[in-house]
Amino acid sequence: MALAHRLCRLPRLLPLAAAAAASKPYLPGKPSPAPPPPLSSPPPFPSLSRLFSTTPSSSGDSSMVVVGSAESFTSIMSKVEAEKLPAVFYYTAVWCGPCRAMAPVISKLSSRYPKIPIYKVDIDMDGVGSKLSDLKIFSVPTFHFYYQGRKTGEVVGANATKLESTMESLHKQL
């Protein structure tokens, strides 16, 4: 958080640094240095929606589903348990660096195993907090694997190898 605070203050400090550089005293007998180039604003950061895009692969066979509300999360979880469906729940957050690192792996797995839906759940979504503590989600990324309506596996952290092997095991059970 301190880094973000420092980064937020950076644009306010840049004009001060430019003014200090421009106010250097003139020394006779020495050529004046060329004036610094005008300050330009940094390029904008990509939008969070682009960083966490869940657009299906070009073949259109992705099984990634973004859970949009606490109500839909509860509904999906109930359906998976009641109908004994295979599923993966991917608990993530937009501010999570390891989650961003795992995004391409998850995208690849959702295309490789289209019969296993992957439900992407943002832990910062309103109304989800109590459900997450009931499920013992304490860090992200966390992946829960369901088979025949019950949780059969869990991967915590950005461990691509373990994630792929657990997904393969779930696929073999189908």
UniProtKB/Swiss-Prot annotation:
Keywords: Disulfide bond, Electron transport, Mitochondrion, Redox-active center, Transit peptide, Transport. GO terms for cellular component: mitochondrion. Its main location: mitochondrion. Residues 60-172 form the Thioredoxin domain. Belongs to the thioredoxin family. Plant O-type subfamily. PANTHER family: THIOREDOXIN-LIKE PROTEIN 1. Residues 1-59 form a transit peptide. It is found in: Mitochondrion. This is Thioredoxin O, mitochondrial. The keyword Transport applies. It comes from Oryza sativa subsp. japonica. The record marks G97, P98 as: Contributes to redox potential value. Probable thiol-disulfide oxidoreductase that may participate in various redox reactions. The keyword Plastid does not apply. Disulfide bonds join C96-C99. It holds the Pfam family Thioredoxin. The active site is at C96 (nucleophile), C99 (nucleophile).
